[in-house]
Amino acid sequence: MLKNISSVSKRFENFKNKEVYDIELYKKTVEEINNINYKNASDTELREISENLKNKVKEGIPLDEVLIQAFTLVKEVAGRVVGMTPYDVQKMAAIALHQGKVVEMQTGEGKTLSAVMPAYLNALSGKGVHILTFNDYLAERDFRWMGPIYKFLGLSCGFVKENMNLEERRKAYLKDITYVTARESGFDYLRDFLCTEVKDLVHRPFNYAILDEADSILIDEARIPLVIAGNVSEEGFNYDHLIEIVRSLKPNVDYEIDQHHHNVVLTEKGLIKIEKVSGCGNLYASENLQLLTRLNCVLHAEILLKKEIDYIVRKGKIEIIDEFTGRVADKRHWPDSLHEAVEAKEGLVSETKGRIMGSIALQYFLKLYPKLAGMTGTAISVMNELDRMYQLKVVLIPTNKPCIRKDYPDKIFTCKEIKEKTLILEIKNINATGQPILIGTSSVEESERIATTLNTEGIKCNVLNAKNDWEEAKIIAEAGKYGAVTVSTNMAGRGIDIKLGGEKELDRKKVVTKGGLYVIGTSRHESSRIDNQLRGRAGRQGDPGESKFFISLEDDLIKKYEIDKMIPQEYYTQKQSESLDNTMINRKINSGQRIVEGYNSDIRKQLWEYSYVIEEQRRIIHQKRHEILVDREPLSLLSNKCPVLYDRYLDLVGKDVLYKVEKQITLFHINKCWAEYLEYVSYIREGIHLVVIGKENPLHRFQSITIEAFNDMLDNIEKDIIETFIKANVTKDGVDIEKEKLKGPSSTWTYLISDSPNQFSRLPFIVKGVLFSLRSISNGIVRKVQETINVVIQK
């Protein structure tokens, strides 16, 4: 198997900005591991070896020096305890993970077991290791599956999932190895920011994390902010009137939609109509900024966001569908005003009102780990971005057995109707042989439409989409059964292998003779990684398998990004029943997909530029607050600014009580002022695009405003601390938290914000709208201005 490694080195030569990895060195280390044999050692002897390794590390021996012995030990114990002995490729992956790299391993190659070796090695230090899984189900599954290995070796293991109480979480994080999602770990980090007592902290200092489905978390979800919010008493805004106004608008007359269907903007006629109906006067006047923001949210909710595609309604709540996985994005919200607008659109009672107390993007949260590694089936295509954003290198791990999956050329059609008819016929023909089929769709709507058609044709199928993702493990486990037909939205990040013959592989031989799992994609996705992950569900561990994509020139991806304009128009006049066997068209579609990937990469970079300053400020505030909380930061503000009052209380209540009072007041106002600052930043960010009217750079202006506001916030913290201290009634028992209004929110909740990149791509449309509003000065002046603008735009 190790002979295949040389081919991996050659593959890296095809990539720009490559880093040459010494795969031969990995091979040498694996051979050293294989040369050590613990088969004749008793269980007691193996445990003694593990204890000796722990002592060596505590004495200061570098982890690299005990790697070979540690990995050999895990190899032997895994075979005894869970009946799984790591393959050589898994050992290679383990070495790379220990080195803090991202490994690309194909589906079914054993990422779960690969992570055990570096997790054990790094946990020997006693500082803790987090294995960050894709969802709660996998966190608990992997804990129960791999936990016995760690226990045998004398290390503790735990897991964290949603709905665990704080004490359960605290105990889990104190274990040597903790299985938890990146989201839950991040939420607990934010909860710690609100703690006023050290005993209430959940996390200990971060050490080392291994991230599963790394490209999904590090790239696709990198900019998604984790949020903790507290309850507020203010009433929500009633959107009914705005919804009524927006529903009266006519497309292409009162509003326009951009080419990517990302943004909607009012025309001059639409602007006049809204100003007349609402009676607000100039909609773009400064006093109407909040109304304008809400109106834009209603426009977005009504016109751009589609039920069953972008979200579903379940149990009276809006649940967002993740564009990459096709499943409900757990605890995900759009920014408050937009989410409230969607709730109003669907006639739901808004449950989103609250003040954001703290937030951090996944990208920055993961950087808090001093050492980070990752695993995924698709990393090579984003290796440059991983390097740029995280300084993470990628290592391609060869498969244990050669991949014999047959990937057929795409079937391309001019129209959706013919594509779907051919697709259904293909499924019928394959199903008649008993070969299991997995159909990957792009939306809930499409998955249900195909399932309905198949049922009409007498073909029973299982459906997995955002509406029933809690049944995911059960449905996927049986997708490889003889005769099974499974219709699913995107398979990315599912984390569950499809075994031929079903979960227990009862019909394995039968399915193998039929060609293994047959994967069908109903369209291309914005990222080729998603397509490749779908293909990768077939052909695991050297199994047979097949894959094929059915594409229409009317597919959303083709139309949305105008890939259709790259294809000669003569093909659009054909309503053929056969697919277009045309390599030129296929190349154009592939090229268009790469352009879209580049566009999305640029957007992620742009979002990073807007968030960088805020993140640096967050880091400063969190660090300062933590130092105060754990008594590493001396408190001298009150003794310096209010010396007379401070000395009086010092004599009255003593040093310890007075220190506790100052600490309580300080922590409260840091939280309060930071929450107010985040609210202000959100408000500024919503309207920052308007500065282009003054010919300013929006990014530079945003950074300038936030830096100035941050400095003001620091001053306000000091002022509020002093003011509270002067007014407070300090006794030997301290201060009455309730009476002095120093108590934080009575309840908090956590969620993620779908941080839309599109708010920064709508500048031309906003400029256009603002220019329309100039007619409030003078109709004659406006006509001249618009004529001038039109000439400039045409040029």
From Swiss-Prot:
GO cellular component, one term: cell envelope Sec protein transport complex
The family this protein is said to belong to: Belongs to the SecA family.
Its membrane topology: Peripheral membrane protein
Primary location class: membrane
Keywords for the protein's UniProt record, in alphabetical order: ATP-binding, Cell membrane, Cytoplasm, Membrane, Nucleotide-binding, Protein transport, Translocase, Translocation, Transport
Any Pfam family the entry gives: SecA_PP_bind
Entry protein name: Protein translocase subunit SecA 2
One annotated GO biological process: protein transport by the Sec complex
Subcellular location: Cell membrane; Cytoplasm
GO molecular function, one term: protein-exporting ATPase activity
NCBIfam families in the record: SecA2_Mycobac
UniProt EC number: 7.4.2.8
Keyword Disulfide bond appears in the UniProt entry: no
Subunit structure comment from the entry: Monomer and homodimer. Part of the essential Sec protein translocation apparatus which comprises SecA, SecYEG and auxiliary proteins SecDF. Other proteins may also be involved.
Alphabetical list of InterPro entries matching this protein: Helicase_ATP-bd, Helicase_C-like, P-loop_NTPase, SecA, SecA_Actinobact-type, SecA_CS, SecA_DEAD, SecA_motor_DEAD
Binding positions (ATP): 90, 108-112, 497
Matching SUPFAM superfamilies: Helical scaffold and wing domains of SecA, P-loop containing nucleoside triphosphate hydrolases, Pre-protein crosslinking domain of SecA
Known function: Part of the Sec protein translocase complex. Interacts with the SecYEG preprotein conducting channel. Has a central role in coupling the hydrolysis of ATP to the transfer of proteins into and across the cell membrane, serving as an ATP-driven molecular motor driving the stepwise translocation of polypeptide chains across the membrane.
S-S bridge residues: none
Reactions this protein catalyses: ATP + H2O + cellular proteinSide 1 = ADP + phosphate + cellular proteinSide 2
